[in-house]
Amino acid sequence: MTAYDPDNIFAKILRREIPSHTVFEDETALAFMDIMPVVDGHCLVIPKVAARNIFDVEPEDLAALVKTAQRVSKAACRAFQADGHTLRLHSETSGGQEVFHIHFHVLPMKTGVPLRPRVMGDHAMLARHAAMIREAF
């Protein structure tokens, strides 16, 4: 398996080298808006530890990440009045992973509303959505 790359985009976001629309942060994790959202409120939850995928992360770090993903999911669903949600974790290219730093996709879902194609989101909209989720905690 390929080693963790400390220059991946999420590592750069953690180091504040690249801006993001932050939803939540604590000592173990960071949640921010996906820049190519497939639904309103689509955000990502990443650990602050360097781990390529689920096979590389320590169990206690994974547990903390899942706890944060649950909190963010609840807030995102409240913010967007979702009647369901999807929580995704992809590992490696064949599993759909595109950024090789373990992360969960949080997708607040509404019945009858399909996923959109992955296209760059408007930054003003992403900032508004991040604020809506932060207010829902």
PLM segments and residue spans:
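HIT superfamily nucleotide-processing domains
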Residues: 1-137
